[in-house]
């Protein structure tokens, strides 16, 4: 399936690597009943040891695709709120386009074999609604580290947590 859509992605070769490796964590976490909880997180860890790909940007793209390849389908299935979609946009910002994430999600779903047309249609309706109303890019943060320094904050170790909380409240 992936080979049919790769040319529609931002980085066709990187996309194909991501499709090949997206389930690489499954052997580590698959249970006796066949479920593979958190295989995406395990996959990112396994990918860290893959020496074939050396470009930092390419590794970041593939890691992000491995980590989030199931998120859109899960969001659609559970009718996730807008804030979940906006948080996902922030997590992939500058690493992977929403377009590429949609393609890997669809390839993953269609690659399993039988997919109910209603389920696939519901996914597209969900995604199109989110994109039309909320966009495909992360909302820029209203404050950054420079602002915190300007306002007199000095504990730089807390900046990341403070900025993440501020961004979440902004959404």
Language model regions located:
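Divalent metal-dependent catalytic cores for phosphoryl transfer on phosphate-bearing substrates
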Residues: 2-117
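Charged substrate- and nucleic-acid-binding regions of tRNA-handling and nucleotidyl-transfer enzymes
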Residues: 109-171
């Amino acid at each position: 399936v992936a080979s049919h859509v790769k040319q529609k992605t931002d980085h066709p070769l990187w996309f194909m690597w991501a499709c090949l490796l997206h389930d690489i964590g499954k052997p580590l976490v698959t249970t006796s009943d066949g479920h593979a909880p958190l295989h995406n997180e395990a996959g990112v860890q396994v990918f860290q040891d893959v020496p074939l790909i050396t470009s930092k940007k390419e590794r970041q793209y593939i890691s992000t695709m491995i980590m989030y390849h199931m998120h859109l389908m899960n969001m659609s299935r559970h009718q996730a709120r807008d804030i979940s979609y906006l948080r996902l946009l922030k997590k992939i910002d500058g690493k992977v386009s929403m377009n590429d994430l949609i393609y890997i999600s669809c390839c993953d779903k269609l690659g399993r074999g039988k997919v109910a047309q209603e389920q696939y249609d519901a996914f597209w309706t969900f995604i199109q609604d989110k994109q039309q109303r909320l966009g495909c890019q992360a909302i820029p943060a209203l404050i950054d580290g420079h602002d915190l320094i300007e306002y007199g904050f000095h504990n730089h170790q807390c900046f990341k947590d403070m900025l993440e909380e501020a961004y979440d409240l902004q959404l």
